[in-house]
């Protein structure tokens, strides 16, 4: 895992703008969508979830991918690797109908056919909580050999927005 922070310095601003990129094990790896994302909120399309960027405070920043149904994706690490953590950040702001998922589930496979369940992380945020909230859903596991990571989130209501699936 490597994290790089880059800044563009503008003489007219008092503080530099910066971008934080997380180079985790799934960074820039192929993602297969078993259920498509919303055409209204595609973000960076097939690379949104593995581009290393976390979203900002708004789901319209081009880093948050929206779903109006359950989410079901498979990340191909392109080689068998040892992993111990899969996490993803979701947003909730109920005014425009954006909710946390009910839960996330993670499965792993070395061949893309036979999957092993690695766990479920249930949502702990009330669907009536009206303030803008973010939650990292996490599945920690004993070190596991995997090439394919299946990530599923269960829609609670309205939209669900996710910015990155981090694999370590």
What feature does the model see in each segment?
Residues 8-10, 90, 108-110:
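Residue-level signal for short segments within beta-strands and strand-turn junctions
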Residues 11-13, 114:
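Charged, amphipathic alpha-helical interaction segments
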Residues 13, 17-80, 91-98, 120-131, ...:
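Disordered, acidic Ser/Thr/Pro-rich linker "stalks" and the adjacent N-terminal cap
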Residues 67-69, 94-168:
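Trp- and acidic/polar-enriched beta-sheet ligand-binding modules for extracellular glycan
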């Amino acid at each position: 895992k490597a994290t790089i922070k880059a800044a563009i310095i503008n003489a007219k601003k008092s503080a530099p703008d910066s971008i934080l990129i997380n180079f985790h094990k799934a960074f820039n790896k192929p993602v297969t969508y078993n259920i498509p994302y919303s055409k209204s909120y595609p973000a960076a399309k097939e690379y949104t979830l593995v581009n290393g960027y976390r979203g900002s405070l708004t789901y319209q920043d081009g880093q948050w991918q929206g779903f109006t149904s359950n989410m079901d994706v498979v990340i191909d690490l392109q080689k068998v690797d040892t992993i111990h953590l899969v996490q993803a950040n979701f947003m909730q702001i109920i005014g425009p109908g954006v909710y946390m998922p009910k839960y996330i589930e993670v499965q792993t496979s070395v061949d893309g056919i036979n999957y092993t369940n690695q766990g479920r992380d249930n949502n702990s945020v009330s669907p009536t909580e009206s303030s803008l909230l973010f939650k990292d859903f996490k599945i920690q596991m004993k070190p596991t050999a995997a090439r394919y990571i299946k990530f599923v989130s269960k829609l609670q209501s309205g939209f669900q927005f996710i910015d990155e699936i981090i694999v370590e």
